[in-house]
Each structure stands twice: as structure tokens, then as C-alpha cells.
Regions:
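Conserved catalytic phosphorylation-site environment of P-type ATPases
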Residues: 77-85, 187, 288, 298-374, ...
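Helix-interface capping motifs at the ends of transmembrane segments in multi-pass membrane proteins
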Residues: 31-48, 55, 67-78, 82-103, ...
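Conserved cytosolic catalytic loops of P-type ATPases
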Residues: 130-223, 328-371, 413-414
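Conserved ATP-binding TGD loop and adjacent catalytic N/P-domain core of P-type ATPases
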Residues: 416, 442, 448-592
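Transmembrane helix-loop-helix hairpins at the membrane interface
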Residues: 13-138, 240, 249, 256, ...
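Membrane-embedded transport module
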Residues: 261, 524-527, 564, 569-642
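P-type ATPase nucleotide-binding
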Residues: 354-480, 489, 501-517, 525
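Juxtamembrane coupling segments of multi-pass membrane pumps/enzymes
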Residues: 10, 79-81, 105-165, 196, ...
Length: 642
């Protein structure tokens, strides 16, 4: 069986020591087999040399079969191979044919197949092992002006570490000195560097490209982003899909069944011929068919290729910055027909910006300038948006007599003129007639020197590729898209219409979102799965309640990594459709392998039972099918162009 573990020391696709030893054994066996066929040695010496060759190529299989028998786990592929090959030896001795080639060939090609699948698994692990390379080996701890290299586990919260160019960021923290560019590709799949400067948060696992950074740590290594991600990936193999569980249960029933069937094939027809038909029993013919039947029946194509397909799919997704917590979630994701979004941070940037300016006799730039100056003392998000739109340093000497009226706005003198900045209530308080605005967003009205000057529209900005992301979801097979938001109905409906979202539910509190998701779950069929996409902030209850929770833009968000089933490391909504496409490709490959292996196996079993298929045919039906299935499985790694 395939063990879905991660080898952190894996480098590239080279063979490991065990694989090299197996290759040497295979080559020695081939040389000996060719020599024995050319030399035509006879008698006991010939048998002895073939047995030596058999032990060289098959001693590990013999050992595993013996351990299985001692542990009362008899029926596995090792047992099948041992019975088939020893039976072939016994049959050759009984017939005095001295042709032991088939017995050796069965074990030889089985081992070639095992080596191939081992190498394929190693190659498929490459993507996840590259992700494992984000684990930092050390941290440069700065104490009393001296830098010492220590294990990241030894660094306490609040310590200062130095990250040199080319080094991995070992712990999460805040930059207190320096600026640089970070390579985040191992985390997000994004090839473009991310620029950082003093005051920016920085997460572990990124690679510092050029500048020297001093970082004040905010988390211990065990709680850092890199540790959370590594734990997530390493545990992904423990969560089995229904397909994998089916194959495991199938193998437990199938292998004993074919063993007893082979025994029946070896005994019943000869006995029927002898006692009921008065014919020669031909035990050698039926035993040969039974041995062929056993070789064909080996289920390794299924038990290897199915988990390998999921492993490759998870590995390919991780390379694109999509972390799937297990093959069960990959399978559920492939069945997603309804996608519900939390609007803020997923479809929109979650950052308020000035989206429109409507003025009376004052130009746009001056209206924004007066608004920003009047709001200079406020820390409200609306004030920040106005100051950002102004884009210049605030000259506070131009502003006096600032008065903030809670829930309404701000009064101030700017350059000696009375300025009022706020909502409709503030205009009504000052008895200043104002114009209603029908655009979605927050409307900031302005009056200067007692006269209405216009209004500024501030809204949450829709991500540039959000509409394309919705379209891609439809192409990926999603039947319905839904937007859940706490925004006002009018603003929510305008965003939904802009993005072509099918349904929108607005003015929802966090608890209301959970109730709405439960309502949506009860209204769908069991075969359809509902995915909820959030940014991980206050979304944990909904992420866990949906059939599958997807956290987007989760770099540095512990809550998202903990609560979600699928974690998208950047905030690109296009990744949602990509994740679904990857899951569909992976499941398609799984079903292809299951159908292909079963059809070929049962067809060849029938041919073996009636005597059409010989041992060489059986070798192809076993090893050939496994090789084809494994080659198909590793296609799940290729996901970049989806």
C-alpha cells in the first residue's frame, strides 16, 4: 500500500538508496536469467541456480508474505506473488520441464513494477517536498548588538531577528528596520515578488530577495504560519476519500476471494473430469490456470494508483498555493455545485476607496482636499479613505476648530472657511439642502461656508478579476453562486449585478450567515455540495458548517488555516475555480484508473480461467496495468494550465 508521507530530504526525482539496490537486484536477475537460458545447465544444479536467482529478486516479497502469515494478515499482493511463483516452480518440477523462467519472470516483472511505482511516488512527492523547503533551518537572533544563529524554536515572542538576502524568514513578525522584496511562490504559487518595508507584517516561509531586514517576532515557531502550513500538508494523507476507503475495503474482500477462486479452479474442474466425466483430471493444466489466475488477480494497480492520484492532485494544488487538507476534501470539492461568498475580502478588496465625486461649482481635487483636511484628526475608515484619496501630506496648520459629531460627521475650519463633512443627518442639522445620491456605498456630503458643495461616494472596491472568477466557476460546473454580506441591500445588489452573482443576501450578521448557509444546505440535493468562501476573519463558524470551507488570502491567518478545508494562500478569487478544476481532474483520473483496472482484471481473469491466457499474459495484466495506471495517476500533478 502507498504511504502518503512527506520525505523532507527528497531532492528532485533521483532514486534513493533502496531504489538503487532494487535496480541492481533487477539487473543481476536479468543477467542470470539470460545466462541460464544460454548455458543449458541441467538437473539439480539448474534448479539450484534458478532458486538462487529467485531469492535474489524476491527475498523481500518472501519476507513480507511470511510476516503477513505470522500476523494473520495473509491475503495481500505479496502472498499472491509467492504462491504463484512457488506454484510455478512446483509445476515445472512436477512436469520435469526444467522451465523455471515463468516463475522468475513473474517475480522479476512484479519487482520492476514496484520499482516504477516507487519512483513515480517519489516524483509525485516532489511538489509537496518543495513546499516542505519553506521550513527554516535557523534564525539569526540579535541580542546586545551580536547576531547568533539559533533554532527557530528557541526564539521568543518580541525577539529581534535579522533576515539576510537569500534566507528564509523563520518566524512571523513585524519589520522594524529595512525594506526588501519577498519571494512568496512556495506559499502562494505567485511568481511576482512582494515588496515590504518598515512597519509591514512579514510571515515565515517567504524568502528574502535583496535587502537586510530586522524583524520583531510576533509568534513562537510552533504557532507560526510556516508551522501551521507544514502541519496541514503532513496531515493531508490521513484524511481518506470515499474512493480510497472503497479500494481498501474492496482489496480486503477481493484478495481472499480470488485466492479461494484460484484454489477452486485448481481442484474442482479436475475432480469433475475425473469422477463425473471419466476423463483425465489434467491437474497440471488446471493448476497452471490457477497460478495464472493468481498473478492476474493482484490488485496493486488499484491500491497504488488511487491514493497516488489523490496525492499527486494535492501536490499539484499545493504548488499553485492551494492547500487541501485531505483527499476527502478534494473529492467533496469536485462535487461542488453551489458556491457561497462572503463579499468583503473575497469578491471585494475589503478596503474603502473614493469611487465617485459629484460637485456643484468646486472641482474634484479641491473637494477631496477640503474633506481630507477636515477629517485629519479622525481615525474612522471613511476618514482614512478620504486622506488616501487626497494622497498628500496633511498640513494641520490649515485646520482649526475640529468638532466630531458622533454618527453624523465632522465640523472644522479649513483655511478660515467653515467646512462640514458628513452624512445627510449632518446636513439636516445645519439646515443645508443636499442632493440624494443613488450610487451604492457611503455618501459623504460636504458644505463649505454654509453652501452645499457636493458629495463623495466611498465604497468597497470590487477586485479586478472577481467577475471573471464567477464566470470561471460556471465553466467549472458550478450551478449557482451566492453572495452573503452585512452591507445594505442596495449596495449588495449592485455588486451582485456587476459580478453576475445569482443570489444575494444582505444585511446579515455573522450568526445570520450561519443560519443562511444551513438553510441553503437543507434546500439542496445530497449529491450537490455547497462551498463557502471567506477570508478567514470572523468566518470560522460558516467555514466549518458548509460542506467544504474555503479560506482565501490566508497568509498569516491562523483562524483561516484552522477552520477551512481548503486554504488559498493569496486573495485571488480565480484560485477558487482552479481548485475545483484540479479536484475534478484528480477525481476523473481516479475513476479512469478504477474502471480501467477492474475491466482489464476481470477480462483477463476470465481468459486465464478458460486457459486462453498464459503466465506471460498474466504478467502484462498485472504489471502492465499497474504501470499504465500509475502513469495516468501522476498526470494529476500537471495543473498549472487549468
Amino acid at each position: 500500500m502507498l504511504r502518503l508521507t512527506v520525505n523532507r530530504n527528497l531532492k528532485g526525482g533521483c532514486m534513493n538508496k533502496k531504489q538503487k539496490k532494487m535496480l541492481i537486484r533487477i539487473l543481476i536477475t536479468i543477467v542470470l536469467l539470460v545466462a541460464l537460458n544460454l548455458l543449458h545447465i541441467k538437473g539439480v544444479i539448474n534448479l539450484g541456480l534458478y532458486l538462487v536467482t529467485y531469492v535474489i529478486i524476491g527475498y523481500d516479497i518472501l519476507k513480507k508474505a511470511g510476516i503477513g502469515i505470522l500476523n494473520r494478515r495473509v491475503f495481500d499482493d505479496n502472498f499472491l506473488m509467492v504462491v504463484a511463483t512457488i506454484g510455478a516452480f512446483a509445476l515445472a518440477i512436477y512436469e520435469k520441464s526444467a522451465d523455471y523462467n515463468e516463475a522468475i519472470a513473474v517475480m522479476l516483472f512484479y519487482q520492476i513494477g514496484e520499482l516504477f511505482q516507487s519512483y513515480a511516488v517519489r516524483r509525485s512527492r516532489k511538489n509537496i517536498s518543495e513546499l516542505m523547503d519553506i521550513r527554516p533551518d535557523y534564525a539569526n537572533l540579535l541580542e546586545d548588538g551580536q547576531i547568533s544563529r539559533v533554532s527557530p524554536d528557541e526564539v521568543a515572542i518580541g525577539s529581534v531577528i535579522v533576515v539576510q538576502p537569500g534566507e528564509k524568514v523563520p518566524l512571523d513578525g513585524v519589520i522594524i528596520e529595512g525594506n526588501s522584496s519577498l519571494n512568496t511562490s512556495a506559499l502562494t504559487g505567485e511568481s511576482l515578488p512582494r515588496d515590504v518595508k518598515e512597519g509591514d507584517e512579514i510571515i515565515s516561509g517567504c524568502i528574502n530577495i535583496n535587502g537586510v531586514l530586522k524583524v520583531s517576532t510576533t509568534k513562537e515557531f510552533g504557532e507560526s504560519t510556516v508551522s501551521k502550513i507544514l502541519e496541514l500538508v503532513e496531515n493531508s494523507g490521513t484524511r481518506k476519500s470515499k474512493s480510497e476507503k472503497f479500494i481498501s475495503k474492496f482489496a480486503m474482500v477481493y484478495t481472499p476471494f480470488v485466492c479461494y477462486s484460484a484454489l477452486a479452479l485448481a481442484l474442482i474442474p479436475p475432480l469433475v473430469r475425473m469422477f463425473f466425466l471419466n476423463l483425465s483430471p489434467d491437474f497440471d493444466v488446471w493448476v497452471y490456470r490457477a497460478l495464472t489466475f493468481l498473478v492476474i488477480s493482484c490488485p496493486c494497480a488499484l491500491v497504488i494508483s488511487v491514493p497516488l492520484s489523490f496525492f499527486a492532485g494535492i501536490g499539484g494544488a499545493s504548488k499553485e498555493g492551494i492547500l487541501v487538507k485531505g483527499s476527502n476534501f478534494l473529492e467533496t470539492l469536485s462535487q461542488t455545485k453551489i458556491v457561497a461568498f462572503d463579499k468583503t475580502g473575497t469578491l471585494t478588496k475589503g478596503v474603502f476607496e473614493v469611487s465617485a465625486v459629484h460637485h456643484s461649482e468646486m472641482e474634484n481635487a479641491r473637494l477631496i482636499e477640503y474633506a481630507a483636511l477636515a477629517e485629519c484628526a479622525s481615525s474612522h475608515p471613511i476618514s482614512k479613505s478620504l486622506k488616501m484619496a487626497y494622497g498628500k501630506e496633511i498640513d494641520r496648520s490649515r485646520v482649526t476648530d475640529i468638532e466630531e459629531i458622533s454618527g453624523e460627521g465632522v465640523l472644522a475650519k479649513v483655511d478660515g472657511s467653515d467646512v462640514a463633512v458628513g452624512n445627510g443627518k449632518l446636513m439636516e442639522r445645519l439646515n443645508i439642502p443636499y442632493h440624494e445620491c443613488h450610487l451604492s456605498g457611503t455618501i459623504v456630503h460636504m458644505a463649505i461656508a454654509g453652501e452645499y458643495s457636493g458629495h463623495i461616494v466611498i465604497s468597497d472596491v470590487v477586485k479586478p478579476n472577481a467577475k471573471t472568477a464567477i464566470d470561471e466557476l460556471k465553466k467549472a460546473g458550478v450551478r449557482k453562486t451566492i453572495m452573503l454580506t452585512g452591507d445594505r441591500k442596495k449596495a449588495a445588489e449592485q455588486v451582485a449585478e456587476l459580478l453576475n452573482v445569482d443570489e444575494v443576501y444582505s444585511e446579515l450578521l455573522p450568526a445570520d450567515k450561519v443560519s443562511k448557509v444551513e438553510e441553503l444546505l437543507s434546500g439542496k440535493s445530497d449529491r450537490e455540495k455547497l462551498a463557502f468562501v471567506g477570508d478567514g476573519i470572523n468566518d470560522a463558524p460558516v467555514l466549518t458548517r458548509a460542506d467544504i470551507g474555503i479560506a482565501m488570502g490566508a497568509m498569516g491567518s491562523d483562524a483561516a488555516i484552522e477552520a477551512a478545508d481548503v486554504v488559498l494562500m493569496d486573495d485571488n478569487p480565480m484560485q477558487i475555480a482552479k481548485a475545483i478544476k484540479i479536484s475534478k481532474k484528480c477525481l476523473g483520473i481516479v475513476y479512469q484508473n478504477i474502471v480501467f483496472a477492474l475491466v482489464i482484471k476481470f477480462g483477463c481473469l476470465f481468459l486465464g480461467a478458460i486457459g486462453v491466457a498464459n503466465m506471460w499474459f498474466a504478467i502484462f495484466a498485472d504489471v502492465g496495468v499497474m504501470v499504465i495506471a500509475v502513469l495516468n495517476a501522476i498526470r494529476a500533478l500537471r495543473v498549472k494550465d487549468l
